[in-house]
Amino acid sequence: MSASRFIKCVTVGDGAVGKTCLLISYTSNTFPTDYVPTVFDNFSANVVVDGSTVNLGLWDTAGQEDYNRLRPLSYRGADVFILAFSLISKASYENIAKKWIPELRHYAPGVPIILVGTKLDLRDDKHFLADHPGAVPITTAQGEELRKLIGAPAYIECSSKTQQNVKAVFDAAIKVVLQPPKQKKKKREAQKSCSIL
């Protein structure tokens, strides 16, 4: 049996959008009830996707501005990014294009990005929305529009609390590394041929 391929997957996004909860939900099937900024240790596990076994390494990052200089250190060697925003936070949605895409393109150009909308369970929760009048739900159409804008191969909405689509997020991250989209290859080949000239 051949050794499984190692895939480094790094979560990125604004503070409090649910990056750590997503990782904890995926790795332990539990949902933390208290918010403690980034207390997820790097995690590695063998995962089987479409019959291929990979060793998935999960790296959490802190979204807060205090970590702007430290955070990019975890980007080195990344195979894929999970770029998360909260489906109930317009600011976190807007920061994908304003802050995170420029940062990732600067420090890790060419690394694929899976766009993820978190807190799906709260988007249609009338009690939550009544208690949080500032919360502006982001629609699936808006998420898809953002995916196209940033050129991400996939957009997935999930809930770490209910576990809806949590596995799908990481399956998509693994698949984009194992089977890169053909469009990106063409772009790279075109770039290579241009740089040769």
From Swiss-Prot:
Q: What are its GO biological-process terms?
A: small GTPase-mediated signal transduction
For the motif Effector region, what are the positions? 35-43
Q: What are the UniProt keywords, alphabetically?
A: Cytoplasm, GTP-binding, Lipoprotein, Membrane, Methylation, Nucleotide-binding, Prenylation
Q: Which residues form the propeptide?
A: 195-197
Q: Name one GO cellular component term.
A: cytoplasm
Bilayer disposition of the protein: Peripheral membrane protein
The family this protein is said to belong to: Belongs to the small GTPase superfamily. Rho family.
Its function, per the record, reads: Inactive GDP-bound Rho GTPases reside in the cytosol, are found in a complex with Rho GDP-dissociation inhibitors (Rho GDIs), and are released from the GDI protein in order to translocate to membranes upon activation.
- This chain belongs to the protein called Rac-like GTP-binding protein RAC1
What gene is behind this protein? RAC1
